[in-house]
């Protein structure tokens, strides 16, 4: 008689870790939705400023009123291996993938560690979500031209870039106005 060797997902093997992730993510990031298919993933938008300090002026304008849209994908090796956080809105351009200054890997996931060994299996996924929200701010700073590269440690625990947010938002305002005007003109042209 042969036994069936059917693979099970990490969340079936470690229900207590699934419960912990759910509890922590739902408390801090209520707009994310969990899908338990395959190895499972979370999707949705992060808050614009979930950091543990006052929000600097200009965040809403810099982010166009919306936090980073993401997919957090688990692998069968979770929690030993960290999940991947993939930015979906905004989605980095193809030429930004694998360039160190953008902190995006070739598989389109964010580079949130110096090395994969920096992930501790007992760490919370919410630490990655905070880093991803910080990545969105830094991405906006690069796009606005007030920075040429992202910081090595991120802005989650470092407020040294906060003063640049309002400047970046001011630089982006004329671009946003032009884009809106162009879109309105195009729409008028199609309705005539």
Segments from the language model and where they lie:
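UBC/E2-like fold recognition across ubiquitin and ubiquitin-like conjugation systems
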Residues: 1-67, 77-192
């Amino acid at each position: 008689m042969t036994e069936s060797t059917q693979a099970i997902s990490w969340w079936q093997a470690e229900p207590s870790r699934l419960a912990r992730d759910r509890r922590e993510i739902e408390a801090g990031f209520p707009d994310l939705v969990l899908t338990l298919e395959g190895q499972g993933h979370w999707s949705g938008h992060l808050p614009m400023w979930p950091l543990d300090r006052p929000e600097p002026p200009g965040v809403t304008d810099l982010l166009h009123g919306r936090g980073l849209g993401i997919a957090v994908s688990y692998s069968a090796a979770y929690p030993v291996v960290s999940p991947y956080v993939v930015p979906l809105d905004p989605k980095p351009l193809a030429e930004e993938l694998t360039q160190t200054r953008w902190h995006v890997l070739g598989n389109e996931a964010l580079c949130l560690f110096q090395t994969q060994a920096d992930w501790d299996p007992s760490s919370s996924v919410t630490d990655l979500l905070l880093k991803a929200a910080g990545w969105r701010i830094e991405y906006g700073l690069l796009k606005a031209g007030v920075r040429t590269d992202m910081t090595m440690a991120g802005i989650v625990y470092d407020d040294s870039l906060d003063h640049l947010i309002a400047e970046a938002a001011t630089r982006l305002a004329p671009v946003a106005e032009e884009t809106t005007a162009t879109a309105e003109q195009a729409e008028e042209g199609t309705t005539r």
